[in-house]
């Protein structure tokens, strides 16, 4: 770390017990003491990294004199202490770093310079798919299949962990990156050779903000920005507005942390917090357990903020002690936070914020969210009514007026034989479910009942609204003992009364760390969960990222043949269309406790207040209230089952891995030996033909529209992580390279191969490209007579051969969701030069610039609809060449010429927001910029 210029004489000494530390005291700079907590962390960062060039005295004073009411305008350079990765985004990062080593050498530089300068840590959590479920060996089977599919990727990552310094990998089967981060990796305060400073961390996953609950400033970035940060490049940003979110009151009985976070998500998304920090304050904060704070922080991308910060206090210290952090580290965290004014003191003067919101926690009520956005909160008491209303958008089937619709039969179709078993023999709780029906009480809603014969020979009926997947999944909730213990206890009470999950429900339990398995064992809750089909399925992201695995064949066939609007209920953070399963249309976020309840109900068309879940052994109706665990029961179980020793044991050898990981055959050497036949790992093309000096920026001429899209297009829509559909360009590529269909794996797992990923860009099965009348990865190919429909990738190949650049048109909130750098990489490799939208989500806008694609916005109040653009026009964009002169134009002129010669002209806003971003764009991307700097030095 370069020594700070220390213009304010801020370097001081902190004595903690018998050990002393150097630190940069905020008290040396007048004004710092009044700042919100999150800006104090930024202020310290600038004090410590002041170099007189990129970070100057003026930048530090700008933070200290922050005007809460002003719009962001002052650029600063933020240097995170570490970088966090998961394997889907991490594999392409390591591919890029390996490629950069060769490129630096080609440009005359030293390849050994390509090493992380600050700690970079990866947790492999995105690759496990729930193939096996509802059986005792589900975990073993899923891990076995995971290694078979991903051996090549895992060999590459193990090579990277040895070839690069300052880079560590947590092996598969350990947990989810964000849960492992808060339970083990997070430092809260760093001790770097006796220099103490706040732990700050950016990650290649948008839910990196989970660490905000621990008082750690950080957020998700694209993989390309993370790579630059690893190599010493600071994160360019504007000093943000900070939204103060005041918490008062206490959470009432019967309300979960999930209910609180869904309420906060709805409030903040409605308020508008994109590009802003959110900070929680008020006396209610002290009543929010650390696990709940982490859950709230985790959902920051869903409400759109850069981060969602909680300050450090006694609750933080209690959590660090519980999770097994060394006492010396805990003492440093407390002493440092108090010395820097970063400790939450009750009744201390409130900081000034840019905007204010307030929530009385006592007013929160049980909720779920869906069917396609996390911010679409539904009161549990109104869930049935809202489902019936939303269902109309997913089916044209008529509303049922009575119970007279006969169920269609699916027996013996598609080669399925009653009594036979699949290779994995997946049957929910091993019972046939004779006579069960998801079409019961269907009067008043669309209904299309289908009778399915189970493998055991029993019959049951499915219908619109059937819960096809009930999944306890995701770090968002599995990191929270109160809701996880609650799920186990409701399962216990349900099992005691003879209730079961419905036979058509795929039941999944995939916690975010092995600690959950430990306390479930201690509390003897596994037998109760297993009685309802919730066997341990894996330690990883699973359902939350679409790794739900296939539904049983007979159920999948029935859903697809009869176009049923099946649903999934998950304890995750995202429920975008097409994300959870290709067989499921409607997705709902809920607490783990409600996941159990919906598995028993078997349908979203259910009123938990007034409808019985079933009958007990004596024939008495059993309602949700009869099996809901009390707060006292949950707390008593937590106290008995969870201890510091549990965390210490599970994290003692966290980097060691299982036998399969240890026995992987890995290559040696500092540069990677690329295999041209590999379908997983290919040398990245971004530096091919790169010169020592950047080429001039050019205007865009005669561009065609690749896609015309609506609002809330997610990075899932742009670059799905889901399974690869046979017959698509990605599948055709794998077929041509001898990959069997069952070995396609997911697009997310193949992010180390740009050939697959290019073909998978804009290939989401739910993408609605308004140029065509079909959902999926299609467009019109205007290089052909009449502009016929074609796969997007195939059209792009033709456009490239014809030398025609491309643009994308879209509506509001373009690029929402995951911090998926491949959504920008794929866009670039397909030949897209500009994306024109009404608004962008933060991370994707930054990623586009990082890949040399210019983000543009329609004039305020305008859209492609209001301007009458139908996507058949040719586009000219002029004014970009001003970037060659060192200035960033505020707007550029866009001329869209229709087929009849009519022109539509408008001034698009250039969303290159900082001088640093302009530098990246001039160089063709952030990695090219960093590479040229390395080669030059």
From Swiss-Prot:
Molecular-function GO terms, alphabetical: 2-methylisocitrate dehydratase activity; 4 iron, 4 sulfur cluster binding; aconitate hydratase activity; metal ion binding; mRNA 3'-UTR binding; mRNA binding
GO biological process: propionate metabolic process, methylcitrate cycle; tricarboxylic acid cycle
InterPro entries (alphabetical): AcnA_IRP_Swivel, Acnase/IPM_dHydase_lsu_aba_1/3, Acoase/IPM_deHydtase_lsu_aba, Aconitase/3IPM_dehydase_swvl, Aconitase/IRP2, Aconitase_4Fe-4S_BS, Aconitase_4Fe-4S_dom, AconitaseA/IPMdHydase_ssu_swvl
TM stretches of this protein: none
EC number per UniProt: 4.2.1.3, 4.2.1.99
Metabolic or biological pathway, per its Swiss-Prot or TrEMBL entry: Carbohydrate metabolism; tricarboxylic acid cycle; isocitrate from oxaloacetate: step 2/2; Organic acid metabolism; propanoate degradation
Region (Disordered): 410-450
Cofactors (names): [4Fe-4S] cluster
Source organism, top-level taxon: Bacteria
Annotated binding of [4Fe-4S] cluster, by residue: 475, 541, 544
Compositional bias ranges of the Polar residues kind: 418-429
Catalytic function, reaction form: citrate = D-threo-isocitrate; (2S,3R)-3-hydroxybutane-1,2,3-tricarboxylate = 2-methyl-cis-aconitate + H2O
Cofactor binding description: Binds 1 [4Fe-4S] cluster per subunit.
Keyword terms of this UniProt record: Iron, Iron-sulfur, Lyase, Metal-binding, RNA-binding, Tricarboxylic acid cycle
First-level EC class: lyase
Compositional bias per record (Low complexity), positions renumbered to this chain: 433-444
Pfam family, one: Aconitase_C
Description of how the protein assembles with itself and partners: Monomer.
Family: Belongs to the aconitase/IPM isomerase family.
Role played: Involved in the catabolism of short chain fatty acids (SCFA) via the tricarboxylic acid (TCA)(acetyl degradation route) and probably via the 2-methylcitrate cycle I (propionate degradation route). Catalyzes the reversible isomerization of citrate to isocitrate via cis-aconitate. Could catalyze the hydration of 2-methyl-cis-aconitate to yield (2R,3S)-2-methylisocitrate. The apo form of AcnA functions as a RNA-binding regulatory protein.
Protein name, UniProt field: Aconitate hydratase A
Organism whose genome encodes this protein: Corynebacterium efficiens (strain DSM 44549 / YS-314 / AJ 12310 / JCM 11189 / NBRC 100395)
Gene for this chain: acn
């Amino acid at each position: 770390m370069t020594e700070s210029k220390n213009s304010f004489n801020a370097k001081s000494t902190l004595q903690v017990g018998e050990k002393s530390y150097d630190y940069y005291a905020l008290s040396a700079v007048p004004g710092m003491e009044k700042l919100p907590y999150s800006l104090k962390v930024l202020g310290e960062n600038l004090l410590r990294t002041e170099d007189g060039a990129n970070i100057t005295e003026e930048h530090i004073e700008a933070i200290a004199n922050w005007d809460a009411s002003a719009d962001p305008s002052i650029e600063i350079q933020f240097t995170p202490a570490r970088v966090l990765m998961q394997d889907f985004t991490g594999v392409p990062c390591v591919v890029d770093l390996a490629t950069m080593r060769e490129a630096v050498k080609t440009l005359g530089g030293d390849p050994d310079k390509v090493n992380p300068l600050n700690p970079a840590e990866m947790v492999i959590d995105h690759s496990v798919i729930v193939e096996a479920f509802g059986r005792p060996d589900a975990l073993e089977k899923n891990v076995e299949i995971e290694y078979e599919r991903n051996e090549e990727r895992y060999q590459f990552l193990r090579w990277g962990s040895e070839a690069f310094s300052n880079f560590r990998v947590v092996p598969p089967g350990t947990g989810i990156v964000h849960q492992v981060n808060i339970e083990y990796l997070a430092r809260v305060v760093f001790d770097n050779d006796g220099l103490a400073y706040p732990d700050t961390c950016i990650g290649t996953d948008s839910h990196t903000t989970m660490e905000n609950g621990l008082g750690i400033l950080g957020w998700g970035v694209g993989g390309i920005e993370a790579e630059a940060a690893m190599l010493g490049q600071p994160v360019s940003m504007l000093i943000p507005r900070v939204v103060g979110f005041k918490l008062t009151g206490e959470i009432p009985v019967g309300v979960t942390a999930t209910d609180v976070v869904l309420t906060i998500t709805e409030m903040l998304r409605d308020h508008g917090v994109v590009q802003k920090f959110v900070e929680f304050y008020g006396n209610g904060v002290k009543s929010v357990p650390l696990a709940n704070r982490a859950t709230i922080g985790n959902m920051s991308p869903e409400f759109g903020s850069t981060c969602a910060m909680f300050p450090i206090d006694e609750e933080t210290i209690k959590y660090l002690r519980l999770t097994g952090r060394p006492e010396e580290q805990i003492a440093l965290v407390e002493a440092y936070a108090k010395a820097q004014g970063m400790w939450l003191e009750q009744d201390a003067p409130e900081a000034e914020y840019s905007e204010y919101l307030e929530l009385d926690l006592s007013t929160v009520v049980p909720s779920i969210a869906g069917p396609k956005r996390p911010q679409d909160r539904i009161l549990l008491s109104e869930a049935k009514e809202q489902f019936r209303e939303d269902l109309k958008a997913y089916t044209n089937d008529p509303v049922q007026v009575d119970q007279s619709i006969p169920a269609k039969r699916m027996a013996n179709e598609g080669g399925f034989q009653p009594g036979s078993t699949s290779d994995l023999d997946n049957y929910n709780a091993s019972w046939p479910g004779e006579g069960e029906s998801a079409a019961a009480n269907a009067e008043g809603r669309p209904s299309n009942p289908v009778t399915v014969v189970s493998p055991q020979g029993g019959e049951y009926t499915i219908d619109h609204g059937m819960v096809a997947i009930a999944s306890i999944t995701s770090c968002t909730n599995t990191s929270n003992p109160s809701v996880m213990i609650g799920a186990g206890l409701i399962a216990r009470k349900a099992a005691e009364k003879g209730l079961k999950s419905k036979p058509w429900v795929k039941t999944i339990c995939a916690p975010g760390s092995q600690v959950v398995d430990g306390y479930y064992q201690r509390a003897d809750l596994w037998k109760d969960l297993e009685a309802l089909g919730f066997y341990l399925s894996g330690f990883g992201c699973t359902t939350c990222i679409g790794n739900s695995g296939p539904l049983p064949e007979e159920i999948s066939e029935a859903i697809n043949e009869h176009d049923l609007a099946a649903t999934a209920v998950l304890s995750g953070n995202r429920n975008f269309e097409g994300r959870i399963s290709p067989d499921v249309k409607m997705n709902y976020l809920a607490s783990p406790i409600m996941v159990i309840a919906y598995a028993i109900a078997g349908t979203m068309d259910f009123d938990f207040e007034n409808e019985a879940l079933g009958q007990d052994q004596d024939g008495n109706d059993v309602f949700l209230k009869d099996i809901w665990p009390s707060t006292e029961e949950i707390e008593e179980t937590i106290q008995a089952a969870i201890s510091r020793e549990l965390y210490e044991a599970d994290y003692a050898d966290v980097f060691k891995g299982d036998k399969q990981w240890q026995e992987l055959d890995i290559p040696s050497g500092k540069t990677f030996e690329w295999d041209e036949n590999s379908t997983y790992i290919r040398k990245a093309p971004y530096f091919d033909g790169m010169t020592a000096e950047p080429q001039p920026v050019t205007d865009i001429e005669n561009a065609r529209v690749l896609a015309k899209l609506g609002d809330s297009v997610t990075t899932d829509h742009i670059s799905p992580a889901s399974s690869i559909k046979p017959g698509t360009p990605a599948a055709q590529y794998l077929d041509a390279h001898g990959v069997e269909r069952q070995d396609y794996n997911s697009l997310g797992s193949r992010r180390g191969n740009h050939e697959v990923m290019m073909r998978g860009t804009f290939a989401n099965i739910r993408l609605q490209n308004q140029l065509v009348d079909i959902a999926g990865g299609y467009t019109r190919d205007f290089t052909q007579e009449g502009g016929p429909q074609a796969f997007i990738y195939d059209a792009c190949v033709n456009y490239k051969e014809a030398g025609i650049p491309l643009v994308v048109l879209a509506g509001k909130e373009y690029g929402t969701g995951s911090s998926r750098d491949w959504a920008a990489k794929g866009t670039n490799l397909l030949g897209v030069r500009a994306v024109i939208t009404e608004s962008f989500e933060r991370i994707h806008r930054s990623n586009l610039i990082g890949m040399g694609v210019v983000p543009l916005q329609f004039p305020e109040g305008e859209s492609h609809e209001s301007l009458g653009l139908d996507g058949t026009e040719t586009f000219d964009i002029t004014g970009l060449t001003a970037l060659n002169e060192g200035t960033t134009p505020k707007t550029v002129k866009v001329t869209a010429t229709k087929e009849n010669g009519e022109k539509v002209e408008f001034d698009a806003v250039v969303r290159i927001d900082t001088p640093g971003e302009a530098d990246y764009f001039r160089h063709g991307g952030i990695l090219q910029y960093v590479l040229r700097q390395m080669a030059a030095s």
